[in-house]
Amino acid sequence: MMLSHWVLLLSLGAVWLAEGGEISPGSCTFENSTCAYTSAFPFLQWTVNIEGHYVSVDSSNGLRGQKAVLISPDLHLAEWSCLRLVYQIAGSESSPSPSSLNVFVRPEGESFDYLLWSAEEHSDSWLISSIDLKNTTKRFKIILEGVLGENTMSSIAIFEVKMTTGYCIECDFEENHLCGYMNSWNPNVNWFVGGGNVKNSHSILPRDHTLNNELGHYMYVDSVYVKHFQEVAQLVSPLIITPISGCLSFYYQLQRETSNIFLVHTRDLHGSYDEIWKMGAVRQGEWNLAEVDLNAHVPLEVIFEVAFNGIQAGYVALDDILFSPVSCSGQEGMFFDAREAGCDFEEGMCQFHQDDNNGSGWSRVKVKPNAYQMGDHTTGLGYFMIANTRFTGQPAYFGRLYGPSLPGNIQYCIRFFYSLYGFYKTIDSLAVYIFEENHVVQEKIWSAHETPKGVWLQAEISIHKPMPFKVVFVSWCKSLWDCGIAALDDISVSIGSCKISDRIPPLPGKCTFEKNDCGFEQEWQRRGIWHRIQGRTPTFYTGPNGDHTSGVGYYMYIEATNMVFGQKAKLISRPLRAVAGKQCLTFYYHMYGAGTGLLNVYLTKEGDINKDTLLWTRKGEQSITWLKAQMEYESEQQHKIVFEAVRGISIRSDIAIDDILFQNGPCNDSSDPLQSSGYSDNFNNIEF
């Protein structure tokens, strides 16, 4: 599962029944039809079961990799809503290519669908998943996509889709689906549904809080089933996928205060727990209100946990879980915008500064790329930070670059690009320290070791500190012969562990070529071929030393030694939906080599096969570094984007592209820093 989480195992009879009256937009019980959902051509058809109740697709209808797609009608959310899906995926669990079920959102006027949720886990029972949807002024559609695996017995079924107003974490436990809450299984002690004239407890249970009568429902856990000291029962919420910040409130009741422990934790995708609430002194036999601030910056679950000291500890009951975007203190729930803590140094040093007592060990520069030095990582021709040059590097000299203060008790992921080069040693010439503002001592958390020169490498560090702190980038010039040059660019800060953020779905229009070719196709007949490669190209004095994404990843390039002068290679995007208004295309290209030919970008509209529109072109050697290209185009027809590379006069004609990004709307900065071959004179002259 892309965003793995606990799900509630349901038998078919335990799944909630649609309430009488009108079904809310986006909901469907699949009794005798797919409601307002429609199947998308030319994909497989979802089949309504002959007895109703669900739709399905299986291996008898199609082959491995084939899709069945259901598209909702146009939807509009004036309020925050929750989409709940009851589904089942059947087949062999050992299959190397299992079936999957995906949920996308398709915003009006955009070419791409955004992945909200995905599952591959097989089950003999129905499962339930909950997905938070932000309120929006833009219309959208929900896309349900089933992808068949290679097993001959593969099948995917959807029992019900239900759209309700409110947050998925909220619950009054009055419906059979229990809002997706489930037990973290314990063979002895578990949470049960109470109320509704249910008589399955040895204790005398209370009325519920919602209705205040015997017909209402709530969750409870009873100590009578305890077999071991402080045995734990956990009730786990649906996974919170969409970031929220505010006040979580709930009502609870207990029979004996001194004989049990009641806690609330959060748990992220990495399995890390964080206690956010603990029961104090309360009135027994009454419903008590609890409130706690909840900041779900990354996907996480909320866990209600009870530990009993013995079988005579009574019960703990839980009801009416609510969430408000206003903090419990009454202030609007505020996110710390981690993006503001980063910097690409294009417009200045952002919130970074140097230690005035030590002088300026770091310099913000823009250099002219040549065979010995690269441009910056952001655009290839922009600004970056550099240390240990002839003018800043002195024996036994430290240069410290301080970042902004970051609030404590939050998990962060720090990413940045660095490059070490020069003719001197580079080991330990760049390090990262943590400076806690209430401590004098700095803690070293990362250092650069001997790395390939002539390439920007990405580093990432996960940090969690209880108190506010600053990240410090330290350059060290040990001696005249051990003073490697250190460069730094594109520092970014995000909430959550770096491992967790890697599991969050990427932007749908983004392709880094790290895993595959992103659906790009090639023209094979009498054409050259684009190759997906990692590292440097085989021919010297042409091509990049590494990719643009991380420095050690993949990119696409043409190998000039396998082509003849003037031969072309075309890389063609998958069909893109027609949308009104401007679209923005961004990518990075590398054209280095004395014999470099041409790189062209075309727009091909459906039905206009012979009328390609040239959007952008470059001819000849451009730079030893990756350069950024950005352009706008419009197409109210289905279309494709074509990258065409033309081999130059010699084998030193490798051309590469990487990090392609399609975005809706005009480009934020549509100006291309390099309008033709050659450079401007607005560069710093740096001696190394």
Swiss-Prot record:
Glycans are attached at N32, N135, N358, N668. Residues 1-20 form the signal peptide. GO terms for cellular component: extracellular region; membrane. It is a peripheral membrane protein. Disulfide bonds: none annotated. SMART domains: MAM. Residues 26-169, 170-330, 341-500, 509-669 form the MAM domain. Its main location: membrane. InterPro entries: ConA-like_dom_sf, MAM_dom, MAM_domain-containing. Gene3D superfamilies: 2.60.120.200. It is found in: Membrane; Secreted, Extracellular space. The keyword Transmembrane does not apply. It comes from the Eukaryota. Induction: By thyroid hormone. Keywords: Developmental protein, Glycoprotein, Membrane, Repeat, Secreted, Signal. It holds the Pfam family MAM. The keyword Membrane applies. This is Thyroid hormone-induced protein B. It comes from Xenopus laevis. The lineage of its organism: Eukaryota, Metazoa, Chordata, Craniata, Vertebrata.
